[in-house]
Swiss-Prot record:
It comes from Talaromyces stipitatus (strain ATCC 10500 / CBS 375.48 / QM 6759 / NRRL 1006). Signal peptide: none annotated. This is Maintenance of mitochondrial morphology protein 1. The gene is mmm1. Residues 69-81 have a biased composition (Low complexity). It holds the Pfam family MMM1.
Length: 493
């Protein structure tokens, strides 16, 4: 019994203590393993591969493989071209930060391959100018339903704007058209003043369809030039113009005889193939930049005005007289024309004479139709094209607006914050918003007599008048606001 109590009893606590230690260590080890697995597979794990761009049937043809050999080939190409690949250890040059674009990136075949467009030439034909033109491509023609909606909205907006400005003395379409057709340098002397009696901008919209992209030979671009062909059709529309004038006989004396003439021309139907392509500007223009005034010739206040104007984007635009860009770089132009197989059906009605009138003379209709056809072919029918410069689509604060119906206070706060961040923390004061435009009026000029707030029933709570209120100017003891200082907090009621 004594031996059992001496050896057996103390042995039980020893076994329980050993099992607790083992369990504690096992639990700690499992927690460490879980944390390590989480860090390895969830935090430092590789991102999954992005989904394929094309359809499931085109996945195999669109698959791109990147291998070590391909990288070696690219490195060899760069070495042969004279430009070695830049490594992280090399210090970049301050004069050549932008990496050169390889010539193959702007090639026509490279663009078609990277955009998965099959424009392989299947039939070549010689044009009158000796160029090769691809008749069609292997890519399926595309419908332009979305493009028709956008064009219809644009034309409808133009029609509405022209009708709203019909009584404007300077922006009326009637005055502009009258000034164009009565140009003394183009109008013959035997035609009296032309008076526009009726204008109809139509009610229907052109329908574009069957769009396809082809590659044409162009000596000015590497690998040819891409061109989009689309069919356009406009029919059953009420697009017409009616005028009145007089034919003057100036022999043997001026205005010896006058013959009144009334004409009405309507477009019955127009159909054709529109060609659109992007071409660079032909000749770069020299830059015209506004010189920066010398700080020694200006006082402190004028210098602050100039710096504040440059920071806030209100400085004179150096590209106002240079449409090609800030530094003379040519812009990209949009060239469009119609193929010679177009169809233009016109309806010409005429009324000649004052007492005994001749109505709808066939010879007059033929002369008018021939003149309109010649005018159209001299401008937009191949090989002649119309070149239009594309606008600048870079986001700018001056073109930023707020959609109608949004929160006015949120729009004012967003506009004030954006202008403040752009001006580098300069003093910016935002006025209340008018109910019509819902745009913040920003003023940061430190030398104006005072800021004016335009009140409105929707912008100012409890204030129904829309008069201007003058804010008293700061006292002479007030320190001068310097751009770059902390902005003042303006609370709008």
């Amino acid at each position: 019994m004594s031996q059992h109590s001496q050896y057996g009893v103390p042995g039980v606590p020893a076994q329980s203590s050993l099992s607790f230690t083992q369990g504690f260590l096992l639990g700690q080890l499992s927690v460490v393993l879980l944390i390590g697995a989480f860090i390895k597979f969830f935090i430092f794990g590789e991102a999954p591969a992005p989904p394929s761009r094309g359809l499931a049937s085109r996945t195999a043809s669109h698959h791109r493989s990147y291998s070590i050999n391909q990288g070696d080939n690219n490195a060899n190409n760069n070495t042969n071209n004279g430009s070695s690949p830049r490594t992280l250890r090399e210090k970049p040059s301050t004069s050549n930060v932008l990496r050169p674009v390889p010539s193959s990136a702007t090639n026509t075949r490279s663009i078609l391959r990277k955009t998965y467009y099959n424009a392989i030439p299947t039939q070549l034909s010689h044009t009158k100018q000796g160029r090769h033109r691809i008749q069609h491509s292997t890519h399926q023609p595309e419908s332009l339903d979305w493009f028709n909606v956008l064009i219809a909205q644009t034309i409808a907006q133009y029609r509405q704007t022209a009708y709203l400005l019909k009584d404007s003395p300077t922006s009326s379409i009637l005055d502009s058209l009258s000034a164009a057709i009565n140009d003394p340098q183009k109008k013959p002397s035997f035609i009296d003043t032309i008076k526009v009696t009726d204008i109809s901008l139509g009610e229907e919209f052109p329908i574009f369809s069957n769009c396809r992209v082809i590659a044409v030979d162009d000596s000015n671009s590497d690998g040819g030039r891409l061109q989009a062909l689309m069919d356009v059709d406009l029919s059953d529309d009420n697009l017409s113009l009616a005028i009145e004038t007089s034919l003057i006989l100036n022999y043997p004396k001026p205005r010896s005889a006058v013959l009144p003439v009334a004409l009405s021309v309507s477009v019955v139907r127009f159909s054709g193939t529109l060609c659109i392509s992007l071409i660079p500007a032909s000749t770069p223009q020299s830059p015209s930049s506004a010189p920066t005034p010398d700080a020694g010739n200006l006082n402190m206040r004028s210098l602050f005005q100039h710096i504040s104007a440059e920071l806030n984007g209100t400085a004179p635009n150096p590209t106002a007289t240079n449409p090609s860009g800030k530094k003379g770089v040519p812009k990209t132009n949009l060239a469009f024309s119609f193929l010679p197989d177009y169809r233009l059906d016109l309806s010409v009605r005429s009324l000649i004479g004052s007492r005994s009138r001749l109505q709808d003379v066939p010879k007059v209709a033929q002369l008018v139709e021939a003149r309109i056809q010649s005018w159209f072919e001299e401008r937009v029918v191949e090989p002649r094209v119309q070149v239009v410069g594309l606008p600048d689509f870079w986001p700018r604060m001056g073109r930023t607006g707020v959609r109608p119906g949004d929160d006015v206070e949120a729009a004012a706060a967003a506009a004030a914050a954006s202008v403040s961040s752009r001006s580098g923390g300069g003093p910016v004061e935002a006025t209340t918003l008018s109910g019509s435009a819902e745009e913040a009026i920003i003023d940061d000029s430190p030398v104006r007599p005072g800021l004016r707030f335009r009140g409105s029933a929707t912008a100012t709570a409890g204030r129904s008048d829309s008069s201007f209120e003058e804010i008293p100017r700061a006292s002479p003891q007030t320190p001068l606001d310097i751009p770059g200082s902390m902005p003042r907090v303006v609370r709008t009621p």
